[in-house]
Amino acid sequence: MEEIRLQPEPMNQVLLRGVLLKAPEFSHENHGKRFDRLTLSVQRLSGTYDHLEILADQTLTQGICLLDGPMLEVRGEIRSFNNHSGQGRRLVITVYARSITPWNGAPENSVTITGAVCREPVYRHTPLGREITDLMLAVSRKYRRRDYIPCILWGSVARMGAQCPVGTELCIQGRLQSRSYVKQTPDGPEERIAYEVSAITAQRLN
């Protein structure tokens, strides 16, 4: 990917309110901290559900009743890492939880990220004629790391995004969605799930 420069204080904020699908499972240990993985189901206005992967420090999952599919509020940020195992998708997208609390109210799925376009946008039309632009946004975090977040833009926002060359800084607001697709592999078709930010608004910052 082309070298890009980002704003000094990029934003990466996620707010999810949904139903826990299953009890947390141990993921890994890093620098003496143990992390759990859990799945949150968040309903859209259309009635469709997004099943989103959450990574959380075990201190956040302790002391909360996690049985019988409770509703939870998760605040955090989107993280990405490359999967080099050769199994499943290469770019893994999760929500890194900063807080997890009980919730008793309406579902919520809101994302605000700022970063730079790091791959040439792809503009296209759906079979129903809707305009779409796919782009990848690089969002900086501490220690010179970056998260690469796939984004999908619609309509007039898609037209604007299609005109953004690599290095363009954007602020995108929308939701984190899950989408099933079929990947053709040497062993035959394989169903996979993609995670991407579906943009409601996108604003150029430079």
Language-model features and meaning:
Residues M1-N206:
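OB-fold and OB-like single-stranded nucleic-acid-recognition modules
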